[in-house]
């Protein structure tokens, strides 16, 4: 398969040639004629076959351009920069012009040693930009963080949003600082010893971009239905150029922005019946570009094929999020059994996910009313990312409230001392009290109204509050309330420092037989080499047997005592002994 035979395999978008020209290439089988409008002139793109059209014209990095489809002006589907947002022109970018200083960087910590920190650029600082985040990197590195995980930065509607309604999947969000700002942040992160993982959304596009994309070609398929809109066309007629558009996006983040890993959003909504699944192909492309680059999946499948090697028939992701760990822990701590939480809440389930990362590994799910999942017996603990808070589990609550302060110490204890790869959500390390609410800045009135109404409708069935009280996503105050205040609890901050310090002393891996619990108490006990984790999930004190332990290494609460082979724990408290 050569580029001459399949023209979509060549670089899409605007590629500066270094000789005062730029090659513009786009997949556009739908229109009769396509021009590129740049420097005040139109230039017709010549057909290359399979709907690919191209032209090399006099232009340079920094020039704005638009494609003109039978007279209709539209941005480039492969745009690298939308300086005026979704409706403005694209801008030619030469990513090679950035003066990188990370020549000695080799990818950062291995997964088994990783501690990930999820952040939203727009609310992480008052300024809400890539550049403003740089000042906080040394502090995160000193805490023990090894990788930042940026929520999506592909160009989305307006000036603020979560990023999951992005349209231009290769363009760094203009309101955050555009491509140059992202390169600055990554370069500074590497200087601070931090890797950077980028959250990317390849299961759908934001509704604001559907009409534009459909003008070019069949980027979407009607074969499948997804919650957020139209499914991307990975296996229907004319899907090859669409696949390549996504693959070039993934590769471009790693190559041109020195991104150390991709977090793939909701892969259970990526539908592909091709002989070679798009996720296998994406892993091939990314790992060929950088063999140390990470691909981490958010999967609602509980299927070990996600991380199984491609050589063994899997999709080859390096790791996946382990939602069941969060659900088992949160419900046990809070008693919140709404929605899909309804089947969680027993300490035996938390013990199970300490042994293996899925609560449902082929057994019956009462929420789904069917058997669900498969045993991950051939997978390793460093292939699963765990958390007690993240953007979804906080922000998809009606008011975006974080874990209650009274249970956060025990939640952090379980998460950070687990055998898995821990991830923190921005601000939890010092007990941030600002909520993280669902906010948008849609530029299309119909979409804005539908989003706000949908949010109210989603929570109308809950008797604990009125749907009218649910924050309006389009109200700027909803966004502003979600910015970090950086005010918290010094005791929580000290606990996180100690937990992350102690984590480095724990042996790698785990023994599934070294986990037990008392459902009646309820308490959990996990042995990790010479160490034993003991957690009391009751609202009253408990005494947990820890035979042979002679040292209290760490306790989440005062009033914890170790004596005579037992550790006495206050309510909702944890201790590490050896």
Region locations from a protein language model:
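Glycan-recognition and catalytic regions of carbohydrate-active enzymes
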Residues: 8-10, 353-373, 424-425, 430-439, ...
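Tight coil/turn sites that cap or link beta-strands
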Residues: 549, 557, 570-574
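Short proline/glycine-enriched turn/loop motifs at strand-loop junctions of beta-rich domains
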Residues: 27-33, 60, 538-539, 547-549
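Conserved alpha/beta catalytic core and glycan-binding cleft of carbohydrate-active enzymes
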Residues: 86, 279-463
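C-terminal beta-strand-rich structural cap/linker in extracellular carbohydrate-active enzymes
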Residues: 28, 61-64, 563-578
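Conserved, mostly hydrophobic/aromatic
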Residues: 26, 67, 119, 140, ...
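Substrate-binding/active-site clefts of carbohydrate-active enzymes
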Residues: 106-111, 120-261, 266-290, 294, ...
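The feature marks proteins involved in alpha-glucan
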Residues: 1-23, 42-118, 123-128, 139, ...
């Amino acid at each position: 398969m050569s580029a001459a035979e399949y023209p979509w395999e060549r670089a899409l978008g605007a590629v500066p040639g270094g000789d005062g020209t730029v090659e513009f290439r786009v997949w556009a089988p739908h229109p009769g004629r396509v021009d590129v409008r740049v420097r005040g002139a139109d230039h017709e793109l010549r057909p290359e076959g399979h709907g690919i059209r191209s032209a090399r014209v006099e232009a340079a990095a920094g020039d704005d351009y638009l494609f003109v489809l039978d007279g209709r002006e539209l941005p480039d589907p492969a745009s690298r920069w939308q300086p005026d947002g979704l409706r403005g022109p694209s801008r030619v970018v030469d990513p090679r012009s950035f003066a990188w200083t990370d020549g000695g960087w080799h990818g950062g910590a291995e997964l088994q040693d990783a501690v990930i920190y999820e952040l939203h650029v727009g609310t992480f600082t008052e300024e809400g930009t890539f550049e403003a985040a740089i000042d906080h990197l040394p502090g995160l590195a000193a805490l023990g963080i090894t990788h930042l995980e940026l929520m999506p930065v592909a160009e989305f509607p307006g000036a603020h949003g979560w990023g999951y309604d992005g349209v231009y999947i290769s363009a760094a969000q203009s309101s955050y600082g555009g491509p140059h700002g992202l390169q600055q942040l990554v370069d500074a992160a590497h200087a601070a010893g931090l890797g950077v993982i980028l959250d990317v959304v390849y299961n759908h596009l934001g509704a604001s971009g559907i009409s534009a994309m459909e003008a070019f070609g069949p980027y979407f398929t009607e074969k499948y239905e997804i919650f957020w809109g139209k499914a991307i066309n990975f296996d229907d007629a004319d899907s090859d150029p669409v696949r390549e558009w996504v693959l070039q996006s993934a590769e471009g983040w790693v190559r041109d922005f020195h991104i150390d890993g991709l977090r793939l959003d909701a892969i259970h909504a990526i539908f592909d019946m091709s002989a070679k699944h798009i996720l296998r192909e994406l892993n091939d492309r990314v790992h060929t570009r950088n063999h140390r680059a990470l691909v981490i999946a958010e999967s609602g499948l509980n299927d070990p094929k996600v991380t199984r090697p491609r050589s063994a028939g899997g999709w080859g992701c390096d790791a996946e999020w382990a939602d069941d760990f969060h659900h088992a822990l949160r419900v046990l701590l809070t008693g919140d059994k709404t929605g899909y939480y309804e089947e969680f809440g027993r300490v035996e389930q938390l013990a199970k996910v300490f042994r293996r990362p899925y609560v449902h590994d082929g057994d019956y799910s009462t929420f789904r009313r069917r058997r669900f999942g498969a045993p991950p017996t051939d997978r390793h603990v460093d292939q699963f990312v765990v958390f007690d808070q993240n953007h979804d589990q906080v922000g998809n609550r009606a008011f975006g409230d974080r874990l209650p302060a009274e249970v956060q110490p025990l939640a952090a204890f379980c998460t950070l001392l687990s055998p898995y790869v821990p991830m923190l959500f921005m601000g939890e390390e010092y007990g941030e009290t600002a909520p993280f609410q669902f906010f948008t800045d849609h530029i299309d009135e119909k979409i804005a109204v539908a989003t706000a109404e949908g949010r109210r409708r989603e929570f109308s069935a809950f008797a604990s509050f009125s749907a009218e009280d649910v924050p309006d996503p389009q109200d700027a105050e909803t966004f502003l309330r979600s910015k970090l205040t950086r005010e918290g609890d010094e005791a929580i901050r000290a606990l996180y420092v100690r937990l992350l310090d102690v984590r480095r002393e724990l042996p790698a891996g785990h023994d599934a037989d070294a986990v037990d619990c008392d459902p009646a108490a309820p308490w959990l006990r996990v042995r990790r080499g010479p160490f034993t984790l003991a957690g009391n999930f009751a609202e009253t004190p408990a005494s947990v047997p820890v035979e042979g332990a002679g040292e209290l290494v760490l306790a989440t609460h005062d009033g914890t005592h170790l004596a005579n082979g037992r550790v006495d724990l206050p309510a909702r408290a944890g201790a590490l002994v050896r």
